[in-house]
């Protein structure tokens, strides 16, 4: 089977004495929704940026494929990385919209990878492309704001506009980097529900970084947990308990729990054995 995302033995060092990513391997199937869980500084954003081809890993250390095509290998970007990036939608924590431009123009940026270069430079869009952008905004519930400046939208609305951009891009993979970190609870719920809806209806693979365990358990059937750049857990979100998280993270578990999950272990005696669980307590 061709995986939507495949990471093999990826390492990244920003300093000689510390690895931001340490021999990370993971596979995500088409149509899967996976939470990338970890405390601040665990390597979540760094991993997502590697998958998107924004940065490269250490020389001679690993490879990344999206839909069977290389993004990077042994610390070098693939020659066709621009085409592969066209299949990847990226949702940033700070929305990455141009505030002075209309919302619809920000959304239509998602089409630029597949239009002639002169049109992408001049940002000239055809009528059917504009209609596609309006349809995408309708799907995320903010089509009434299409011709307003992006800066006039609330944080939650801006994040939904960013998700609409991935829809017009027709991305088969969505990477979302802490998409709810700066949002209020209701906006957070809407954004996560929207990502789940896109995952289910479009069969898009979604990898979303989070630091809230309760959100990961509510929206993502599978969790990949990082600590100090290492994968310390890969398995069903339903199998995670506060006790297990404290075993994996120690005092860092408090940042993940945030009193949002009852501080008690769920008995595993009655819980069916997870189909796939990888734990690395040595890395923790």
From Swiss-Prot:
Kindly indicate whether the keyword Cell inner membrane belongs to this entry: yes
Per the record's keyword annotation, is Nucleotide-binding included, yes or no?
Answer: yes
Where is this gene product found?
Cell inner membrane
Q: Please give the Gene3D superfamilies that the UniProt record associates with this protein.
A: P-loop containing nucleotide triphosphate hydrolases
State the Gene Ontology terms under molecular function: ABC-type phosphonate transporter activity; ATP binding; ATP hydrolysis activity
The way this protein sits in the membrane is described as: Peripheral membrane protein
Q: Which residues hold ATP? A: 38-45
Q: Which GO terms describe its cellular component?
A: plasma membrane
Listed A to Z, the keywords are: ATP-binding, Cell inner membrane, Cell membrane, Membrane, Nucleotide-binding, Phosphonate transport, Translocase, Transport
Which chemical reaction does it catalyze?
phosphonate(out) + ATP + H2O = phosphonate(in) + ADP + phosphate + H(+)
Where is the ABC transporter domain positioned along the sequence? 5-253
Q: What is its EC number?
A: 7.3.2.2
Assembly, in brief, is: The complex is composed of two ATP-binding proteins (PhnC), two transmembrane proteins (PhnE) and a solute-binding protein (PhnD).
According to its UniProt entry, the function of this protein is described as:
Part of the ABC transporter complex PhnCDE involved in phosphonates import. Responsible for energy coupling to the transport system.
What's this protein's family per the entry?
Belongs to the ABC transporter superfamily. Phosphonates importer (TC 3.A.1.9.1) family.
Q: What name does UniProt use for this protein?
A: Phosphonates import ATP-binding protein PhnC 2
